[in-house]
Structures are given as C-alpha cells and as structure tokens.
Curated annotation (Swiss-Prot):
GO terms for molecular function: ATP binding; iron-sulfur cluster binding; ligase activity; metal ion binding; oxidoreductase activity. Keywords: ATP-binding, Iron, Iron-sulfur, Ligase, Metal-binding, Methanogenesis, Nucleotide-binding. The gene is cfbD. Involved in the biosynthesis of the unique nickel-containing tetrapyrrole coenzyme F430, the prosthetic group of methyl-coenzyme M reductase (MCR), which plays a key role in methanogenesis and anaerobic methane oxidation. Catalyzes both the six-electron reduction of the tetrahydroporphyrin ring system and the gamma-lactamization of the c-acetamide side chain of Ni-sirohydrochlorin a,c-diamide to yield 15,17(3)-seco-F430-17(3)-acid (seco-F430), the last intermediate in the biosynthesis of the coenzyme F430. This is Ni-sirohydrochlorin a,c-diamide reductive cyclase complex, component CfbD.
Length: 359
C-alpha cells in the first residue's frame, strides 16, 4: 500500500552495472528524475526524450531516433541503453524500430520497461535488461540465468520478510544509534562471542562495510569480533567484483580480517542463510547484520542481534523477525553511487564515538 521502488529505476541501475555509457529514458523529462541524476554521479550519461502531452497522442519515435543520434554525436558511446516508461509503453512505442532507424555505430539495448511491468516489482525491470543483454551476447546466458534467479529470490524475501508484504508499513528510523553502539561494545568487552555480518547489495556495501574497519581489538585484544561478508570478488559482473575487491582491501588495511566469505555482492538473497549457518557453527552470542538483514533467518538463532538497514519501512518488519535492535542508515544509494572506497556510516560513527569513550 506504500510506494516502492520502480522497475524503471531497476532497469537503469542494471544498465549501469553492465557499464552502459549512455541511458536514454523514452518518456517525460521528469520520469525517474532522482535515479537519473544519481546515476550521473556514477559516470553514466542519462538523457530523456522529454515526451510531452502531444506525444502521448501522436507518438514520439522520431524524438527517440533524434536523441539516439545526438547522444552518439556528443558522447561516442560503446553501449547505450534505451528504457521505456509508463508514457511510452502505454501508447505502444516501438523502441527497437526507432533504434534501427537511428543507425548509430554502437550497441543499443532497448528495454520495454515501465512502472507496472510484470507484477510491478522493481526486480522485473532488472530481469528484462539481463534477458536483453544475454540475447545480444553482452553477458553469457549462464550469468543472466544466475542473476535472474537471485532477483526472483530477492523479490520473494521482500514479499515474505521485507517491505513488500502487501500492507501499509509505517516508516521508522529505528533505535538510538549511540545506545545500540554501546551495547555492541559492551558485548565485546564482556568477552561474548560477537560477529559482524555484511550481507549487502552491490555498491551499498561501501556504506555497510564501514563498521568492519573499526579498531575493535583495542577493546578486548583477546576477543576480536568475527567478520562474515558476502565479498567474493570472483562472482558477478566486473563492476560488482571491483566493489568486493575494493572493500576487502580496505578491511585488510584497517588491520581487520574477513574470516568467512559467504558469496558475491549480488547474492545477498542466499548469503544470509550461509551466514546464519556460520553463526551457529561459531557459537556466536551477539551478531550485527548489515545491508539486507531480513535475508538472514535471525529468528532461528536465539542470540542478541542488531539489524542495520537502509529502509525506514524495514525497521518494523525486522523487529517482527526477532532482531533485538534495529538501526536505519538513510540514503544508502545516494551516498554510495560513484564511490570506489568505504563511506563512513551513521552507525559506524556512533561506534567510533563510543569506542573513544570506553577505552
């Protein structure tokens, strides 16, 4: 009943992950404005055909053809994405025909997405891009199938454990970060078995990995927390692998070490269960789970726990799952787009402040 991410935005992000140089939105100039502006900070040129009221009646394929040609003249792109919107798809615009007429010497992926595509889940927009990319040989068929499987599992998690459960969820900003930070530090100093779990999605991991670089050894040298993370640098598209490699390097430079790798940064729907098994085997008593904490079956573990999420509408579902404490990081996408190194998080700052107080 509340607004949720759009398939159009997911199409844009997935084209970015494929290293598209230019993305053209075939629709009104305000459609997906925020996402388009954010992606510009990540090195992608986002253009629009700026459809108007008259175009809704008579069509705007000529505008798309012209925009494609101008885009090539300005940027000489190797890969261009053309993404449909509600306006262009409702009137039946033929994106592929306009692309053929443009005749630019670049690879062009035409994606007939819109706000209600499929069942309206944002992952539908990502899936249609992956299918088109595999069809054109941009990515292997097996890689597309793997990612589509992950996206479908992610949708299932959101519908059963997250903010897409079909009811109105009141936004909340979670517990006081300083109070929760003190509770984490007390657990380490008391000698309890503590683990930090990164189960994050793509570039948002630059924010959620911040807590993995802190000097916890100064609190209790004989009881450093265990670090578990979905940072396999051999899984995913090249851009996603680079994110994992960058973060692992920074963690190592901080003097900390990732003891357990659960999978890749696009495998968060399944790495939560793997992390839970490690928590059981390591007999962990206190866990801090960051990124997509609702993908980890905390209700099966019987431990004190902290969920660190980026969604105000995920706070209440996470409490319902059994997390002892929940804190929210705002604007994770906006803060991490275009980043190539770890970004300081609000909860990380709370931990830093309180480490200084207790030492």
């Amino acid at each position: 009943m509340h607004p949720r991410p759009s398939p159009i935005a997911a199409s844009l992000y997935t084209l970015r992950d494929l290293d598209a140089d230019v993305i053209i939105l075939h629709g009104p100039h305000g459609c997906c404005f925020r996402t388009g502006r954010l992606l510009e900070t990540d090195g992608v040129r986002v253009l629009t055909t700026a459809m108007s009221e008259q175009d809704f009646i008579f069509g705007a394929s000529d505008k798309l053809t012209e925009t494609l040609r101008k885009a090539y003249e300005m940027f000489s792109p190797k890969l261009v994405g053309v993404v449909g919107t509600c306006a262009s798809m409702i009137i039946g615009e033929d994106l592929k025909e306009a692309v053929q007429r443009a005749g630019i010497p670049a690879r062009v992926l035409a994606v007939e997405s819109h706000g209600g595509f499929g069942e309206g889940d944002n992952t539908e927009g990502a899936i249609i891009v992956l299918e088109a990319a595999a069809e054109q040989g941009i990515i292997p068929e097996e890689e597309a199938e793997r990612q589509i499987k992950m996206l479908k599992l992610a949708t299932e998690i959101e519908k059963t454990r997250g903010m897409a459960q079909g009811k109105y969820i009141r936004p909340s900003y979670g517990d006081d970060k300083d109070e929760v930070a003190l509770r984490v530090l007390e657990a380490i100093m008391e000698g309890r078995r503590v683990a930090f779990v990164l189960n994050a999605k793509k570039e948002t991991s630059y924010l959620f990995a911040d807590t993995l670089t802190l000097p916890f050894g100064s609190l209790n040298p004989d009881n450093p927390p265990i670090i578990i993370a979905n940072l396999d640098k051999g899984i995913g598209l090249p851009r996603i692998r680079r994110h994992a490699e960058n973060i692992l390097s920074e963690i190592e430079r901080s003097g900390n070490r990732v003891e357990h790798i659960t999978g890749g940064l696009d495998e968060y729907p399944i790495t939560g269960a793997r992390a839970a098994e490690i928590l059981r085997n390591e007999e962990i008593e206190f866990a801090v789970v960051s990124g997509v904490p609702h993908a980890l079956p905390v209700e099966e573990l019987g431990l004190e726990s902290v969920a660190v999420t980026d969604g105000p509408r995920l706070v209440e579902p996470l409490r319902g799952l059994g997390y002892t404490h929940v804190v929210a990081e705002l604007d994770a996408h906006a803060r991490t787009l275009g980043q190539r190194s770890i970004v300081e998080s609000d909860f990380g700052d709370a931990l830093r402040r309180n480490i200084k107080k207790v030492i």
